[in-house]
Swiss-Prot record:
Name of the featured protein: Short neurotoxin homolog
Signal peptide positions on this chain: 1-21
Record has Disulfide bond as a keyword: yes
UniProt source species: Bungarus multicinctus (Many-banded krait)
Free-text tissue specificity from the UniProt record: Expressed by the venom gland.
UniProt xrefs under Pfam families: Toxin_cobra-type
Highest taxon of source: Eukaryota
A GO cellular component annotation in the UniProt record: extracellular region
A GO MF term: toxin activity
Family: Belongs to the three-finger toxin family. Short-chain subfamily. Orphan group VII sub-subfamily.
SUPFAM superfamilies cross-referenced by the UniProt entry: Snake toxin-like (SSF57302)
Length: 83
């Protein structure tokens, strides 16, 4: 019985994946190749845009502890969600 209980505890810990960090895209619009990073300081991926010139919009991507306070930030909390 103790062995079964210990097995269930181990399986639960493995399935819950304690210490999970989210993976976010960190590439800006004009950077190649696409890069990903483990977001260790937080659990939010973000994407927002800025206008460099009237004809060029730059999209910024990254990860943060909480959603940045900007007017048009899109935040999400699943892996690679900030396309």
């Amino acid at each position: 019985m103790k062995t079964l209980l210990l097995t269930l505890v181990v399986v639960t810990i493995v399935c819950l994946d304690l210490g999970y960090t989210i993976i976010c895209r960190t590439r800006d619009t004009y950077q190649i190749p696409i890069t990903f990073t483990n977001c260790e300081e937080g659990h939010v991926c973000y994407k927002y845009s800025t206008t460099e010139t009237p004809n060029r919009i730059l999209i910024h991507r990254g990860c943060a502890a909480k959603c940045p306070k900007r007017l048009r930030v899109i935040c999400c909390s699943t892996d690679k969600c900030n396309k």
